[in-house]
């Protein structure tokens, strides 16, 4: 088998309201015709994949169904949210269409490649290093995914219905659309100023500013040499801390230094990470990290250095082994455990040496042995939720500190015996302020329940979720909607409002053309959604673009359907008599001749939606849908959408228009030489025009539905007609004046 075509459908599509990867799989004739050989291949494949896939029934299953099962199993194995898949004939000989929901396109492609390679290896009786390939696939997926800070923030935004667009291969993400967009990279938002971030990186400058505000900070200064470091240590009092002035993540930090040799070694270590080095007084207490978003403390954790308590019998090494048997401890990659294993490394050995111990020492009963001494590495330390233990004075001091630096999201590192008392009462102090704080320590499994850090950051960016969306008017592209898009763009472009338009005649921002290429496709629409100056978006989308790329948005203010694309059915609806839907490993079969209206989009269905119905459902979910009921297929959507549908017709006697008015719904029609807009039995706007047409009818009804005043629309139409008449007369006059010249030339 081989993939003839692979399509990435980002956003709502004909299969699902989630992103889908769709593959067209070609199967060899021999494999299709030889049932015994096929059964043998599937039995061997089921045996090899049984450790992570549900392989029951594979032996008697068709090849592409098995491939689909294996593809889904691989996606789940690497942690992708692949819940559903579909298999059906593509309407071509020996070609089957497979589609799966996926979170990341590149990961889904890699899983498909491995599934095809695995199937081919079994069919050819070749050995394949599946274990190594799976390990490589997991590593690729881990590298490709958003990090442990950005990922939860994106998930929180999507849970609130806020669109998220990944802008690079790292962690730069845009939330929201057009002029309402906001951006984050890890926990740094676009409100984080360059100056504020620079202040936070400079630990000495931060400390000086905090001291001027009267906030408690450790005594210390910047040093320029090893001798100066020793002099500064003697000034501030022992023990001391030596650290880089502008490094992150605890790099180059040495604690509890008491001798000149230790200070000299620590100075050299710090110089590896920064040209400038700080020497500070060592504060006594537990390290704390407090996370602040805006003007609120959202989370706080206390770190207690790993330690053992002697029993008079066992050695240090045996006590560490017992410590690591705590079920709360695990490997760094084990996200279900709040603490890491305590390593038996040089840092622990140094800590033991300072306490006159070694690995084989037997501590006395009740004797405490700290397993961290001079290293700032917190691996193996205990982490405890301290959010509910913060004294009001401490909270105010920390918020003032972050406000002084100028950050909107920050992590404050401080030393305190506990947070239940003011810092000046316990000789605690603020160590530094981080502009790029990690949020994982405030969530499960350290904090149970998790502190709502991602949700707080999203709420900080968008107090109301609907603030993230710009109004989008989407229409199924045809020759009539060209004129509709121009009318609507002109009407919406008022004052300082900037309208982006993607249509068959190019990409536009107001009156400025950004591209002359045909732009009725998802790629061009998405480019306008990323444009920071677009306040409203009017777009045409071709049926082919929607089938091949999906919709670039999950909601719109209005959808316009003037001609049906149903005469060009999705290729998956052509040919074949069986379709298969997979969910959680269970194969389901349906009749491909089932009427499309019976398929439940977003639920278990094997047949894709029509493009018309897809756009109609997206429009009806939050807005309204203008439907040309003169088209027999489109007319069937009116009853399905209810009062979200606005029927329009060239015929005032159209039954759908009459029924809508009798129900109190909105409708529009052409009556004689006038366009009539109505709500129930009340006729809201009657626009006399010498040339009533479907495009103007649709544009007027859409504009009214978007909130444009009827009188404004009437004046706009009148003005455009006057301009058109004046232009026609001027052209005719020029033509008459040029006739003699033309005759002379001839």
Model-found features: residue ranges?
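Short acidic-glycine loop/turn motifs at beta-strand connectors
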Residues: 177, 292-296, 418, 670-671, ...
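ATP-dependent carboxylate activation and anion-phosphoryl transfer catalytic cores
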Residues: 1-158, 296, 304-311, 315-318, ...
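Conserved nucleotide-sensing/catalytic segment adjacent to the nucleotide-binding pocket
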Residues: 513-545, 549
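Acidic, Mg2+-coordinating active-site environments of NTP-dependent enzymes
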Residues: 469, 548, 554-746
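Walker A (P-loop) phosphate-binding motif
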Residues: 465-506
């Amino acid at each position: 088998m081989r993939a003839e075509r692979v399509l990435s459908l980002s956003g709502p599509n004909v299969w699902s309201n989630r992103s889908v990867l769709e593959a067209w799989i070609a199967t060899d004739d021999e494999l299709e015709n030889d049932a015994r050989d096929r059964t043998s291949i599937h039995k061997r494949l089921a045996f090899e994949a049984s450790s992570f896939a549900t392989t029951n029934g594979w032996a008697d299953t068709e090849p592409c169904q098995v491939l689909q099962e294996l593809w889904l199993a691989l996606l789940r194995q690497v942690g992708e949210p692949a819940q559903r898949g579909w298999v059906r004939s593509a309407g071509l000989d020996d070609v089957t269409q497979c589609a799966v929901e996926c979170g990341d396109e590149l990961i889904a492609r890699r899983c498909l490649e491995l599934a095809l390679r695995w199937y081919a290896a079994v069919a050819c009786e070749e050995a394949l290093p599946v274990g190594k390939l799976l390990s490589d696939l997991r590593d690729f997926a881990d590298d490709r995914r958003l990090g442990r800070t950005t990922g939860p923030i994106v998930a929180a935004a999507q849970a609130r219905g806020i669109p998220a667009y990944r802008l690079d291969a790292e962690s730069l993400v845009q939330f929201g659309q057009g002029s309402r967009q906001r951006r984050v990279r890890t926990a740094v938002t676009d409100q984080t100023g360059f100056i504020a971030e620079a202040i936070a990186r400079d630990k000495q400058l931060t400390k000086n500013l905090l001291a001027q505000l009267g906030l408690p900070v450790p005594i210390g200064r910047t040093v320029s040499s090893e001798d100066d470091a020793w002099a500064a240590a003697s000034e501030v009092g022992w023990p001391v801390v030596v650290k880089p002035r502008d490094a992150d993540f605890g790099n180059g930090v040495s604690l509890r230094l008491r001798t000149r040799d230790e200070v000299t070694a620590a100075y050299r270590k710090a110089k590896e990470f920064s040209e400038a080095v700080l020497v500070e007084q060592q504060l006594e207490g537990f390290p704390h990290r407090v996370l602040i978003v805006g003007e609120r403390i959202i989370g706080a954790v206390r770190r207690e250095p790993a330690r053992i308590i002697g029993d008079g019998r066992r050695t240090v090494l045996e006590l560490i082994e017992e410590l690591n048997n705590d079920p709360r401890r695990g490997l760094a990659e084990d996200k279900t455990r709040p603490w890491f294993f305590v390593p038996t490394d040089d840092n622990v050995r140094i800590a033991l040496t300072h306490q006159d111990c070694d690995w084989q020492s037997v501590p006395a009963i009740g004797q405490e042995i700290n397993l961290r001494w001079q290293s700032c590495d917190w691996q193996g330390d205990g982490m405890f939720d301290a959010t509910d233990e913060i004294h009001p004075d401490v909270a105010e001091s920390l918020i003032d500190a972050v406000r002084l630096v100028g950050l909107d999201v920050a992590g404050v590192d401080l030393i305190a015996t506990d947070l239940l008392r003011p810092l000046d009462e316990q000789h605690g102090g603020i160590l530094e302020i981080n502009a790029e704080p990690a949020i994982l320590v405030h969530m499960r499994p350290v904090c149970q329940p998790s502190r709502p850090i991602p949700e707080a950051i999203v709420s900080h960016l968008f107090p109301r979720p609907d603030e993230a969306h710009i109004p989008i008017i989407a229409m199924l592209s045809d020759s009539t909607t060209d004129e509709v898009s121009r009318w609507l763009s002109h009407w919406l472009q008022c004052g300082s409002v900037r309208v982006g338009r993607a249509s068959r005649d190019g990409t536009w921002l107001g009156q400025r053309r950004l591209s002359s290429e045909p732009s009725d496709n998802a790629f061009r629409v998405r480019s306008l959604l990323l444009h920071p100056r677009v306040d409203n978006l009017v777009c045409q989308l071709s049926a082919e673009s929607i089938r091949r790329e999906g919709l670039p948005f999950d909601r719109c203010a209005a959808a316009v359907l003037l001609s049906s694309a149903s005469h060009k059915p999705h290729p998956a609806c052509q040919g074949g008599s069986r379709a298969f839907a997979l969910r959680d490993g269970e194969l389901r079969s349906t009749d491909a001749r089932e009427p499309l209206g019976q398929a439940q989009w977003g639920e278990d269905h094997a047949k894709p939606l029509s493009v018309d119905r897809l756009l109609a459902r997206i429009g009806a979910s939050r807005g309204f849908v203008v439907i040309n009921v003169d088209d027999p297929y489109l007319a069937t959507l009116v009853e399905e959408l209810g009062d979200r549908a606005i029927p329009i017709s060239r015929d005032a006697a159209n039954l759908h228009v009459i029924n809508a008015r009798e129900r109190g719904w909105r409708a529009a029609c052409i009556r004689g030489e006038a366009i009539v807009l109505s709500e129930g039995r009340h006729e809201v706007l009657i626009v006399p025009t010498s040339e009533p047409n479907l495009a103007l009818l649709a544009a007027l009804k859409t504009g009214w539905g978007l909130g444009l005043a009827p009188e404004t629309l009437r004046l706009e139409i009148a003005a455009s007609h006057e301009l058109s008449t004046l232009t026609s007369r001027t052209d005719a006059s020029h033509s008459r004046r040029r006739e003699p010249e033309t005759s002379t030339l001839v």
